[in-house]
């Protein structure tokens, strides 16, 4: 386990059934989030061994959101490593390969080949002004 992830073996085990452990990765300080900017967070590699990252940003309502950086049309990062995640007007996440536009508030594609599909949402946990990305549901 890296210094950036925490495991809580009792996570969700209130009914006596075994539950998956909480695995969280340090995201960023809440104060680092600025409207119109995206913070990328490296995630543990999954079964495919490909690098993965989360995109942490503020929705139009000012609440933090987090999505897996993976287009819904093809399983590739929306920025292809360029670190350019947003449209010029900063109103949508942009897949640089397909031109898909995703809403900031819910990650739903509004234009492009994956119309109406949503980016994978990753839960955020906030503790004392620090945001952690819950990666428990991702493939190990």
Spans of features found by a protein language model:
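Short beta-strand His + acidic residue motifs that chelate non-heme Fe in jelly-roll/DSBH
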Residues: 102-103, 111
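Short cysteine clusters
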Residues: 71, 95-98
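N-terminal pre-ligand scaffold of iron-sulfur
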Residues: 1-88, 103-104, 118-140
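Short cysteine/histidine-rich metal-coordination sites, predominantly Zn2+-binding motifs
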Residues: 85-94, 109-117
